[in-house]
Amino acid sequence: MSHAAPLPDLPQYQSPMFIPRYQPFSGARWSLRHADMVLCPGYWTPPQLVNGMALLTRIDDSGKPHTWMSMSPMEIESQEIGCQHARGHVVVMGLGMGWAAANAALHPAVSQVTVVEFDPEVIAAVSQSGIFDQLPESARARVRVVQGDAYQYVPDTPADTLLADIWLPLFGAERDAEVRRMCANTGAGQVYFWGQEMVIAHRARQRGLA
């Protein structure tokens, strides 16, 4: 009689960043739900167990659902550098689950956070969970969400920091060109975009530097 192998003693993921509480949401194309226990690799760290992980999913034009974002170690670790180094007026391209905007607003060097989101249903999902209402008043007052196009948006006052995450895949070979366009529109002096380490490595390989 065979017996299942015991599960390895895996660490449970604990992020040093703020993790909002999410409420279930079901819209025409977007939904928010939770996974009870998931084994997830990190962006910088080995696999860890995550309990009650929130996921934002989107149904594509063929009717197939895709996980667009989640509170997984991969997602958090791949964006936390941008949040930790944000300053001044921060423009966040892509609301997602509101995580990056919330953590940027908590940074003492940040004075204002403007979030640009194209899809009103994503805005509704984050609003239903009251993500920014979970922040201290001083941080909550810094956040403003506007519906707009990340490639076209020009802020009323120039940005100091640009945080961009509007893509489904982690890597895009031409993503830096898209981000340069956003920088030109916003006037941002510093930028962090999702997957930028992979783009840097890709450019280095193209030039024979790696």
Q: Model-found features: residue ranges?
A:
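Short polybasic amphipathic segments
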Residues: G52-S62
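Long, low-complexity, intrinsically disordered polar/charged segments
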Residues: M1, V50, G63-M69
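N-terminal auxiliary segments of SAM/dcSAM-dependent transferases
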Residues: M1-V50
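Conserved SAM-binding loop and adjacent beta-strand
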Residues: P46, H66-Q79
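The AdoMet/dcAdoMet-binding core of the Class I SAM-like
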Residues: M1-I19, M74-A210
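Surface-exposed loop/turn and secondary-structure junction residues enriched for glycine/proline
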Residues: R33-A35, I59, G98, V113
